[in-house]
Amino acid sequence: MSNTETANPTAKAVAKHVRVTPMKARRVVDLVRGRSVEDALNILKFAPQAASEPVAKVIASAAANAENNLDLDPSTLVVATAFVDEGATLKRFQPRAQGRAFRIRKRTSHITVIVESLPKTGTSTRNRRKGSAQ
């Protein structure tokens, strides 16, 4: 992704091979997509899901990348894109009765977050999107 003059500047962070199932991580990512970075981190701090911790780390890393590499103001950052892909699956065996064995699949995730710097306005991205649809 190249930053052009007309587009808003973006920063990206990726966490690979995170030991959480992609389905559970997607539930958490759906909570914060489109929100400001500050709101997203506050939501994840109190979310009961275990996947909220690695997602919060990736969002914080993307915000730090934007601040340190692109000199962007952290208060203007919004989680523009966030998605979870499936990583490698660790295969384990659980011994069962009479010599059988069941396969256990320990799934991993690749969590990607792209934050975007928006000009400061009175409404958030989520409110503007809802208002335009009505």
UniProtKB/Swiss-Prot annotation:
One of its GO terms (molecular function) is rRNA binding. Keywords: Ribonucleoprotein, Ribosomal protein, RNA-binding, rRNA-binding. GO terms for biological process: translation. One of its GO terms (cellular component) is cytosolic large ribosomal subunit. It comes from the Bacteria. Belongs to the universal ribosomal protein uL22 family. This protein binds specifically to 23S rRNA; its binding is stimulated by other ribosomal proteins, e.g. L4, L17, and L20. It is important during the early stages of 50S assembly. It makes multiple contacts with different domains of the 23S rRNA in the assembled 50S subunit and ribosome. Part of the 50S ribosomal subunit. This is Large ribosomal subunit protein uL22. It comes from Rhodococcus erythropolis (strain PR4 / NBRC 100887). The gene is rplV.
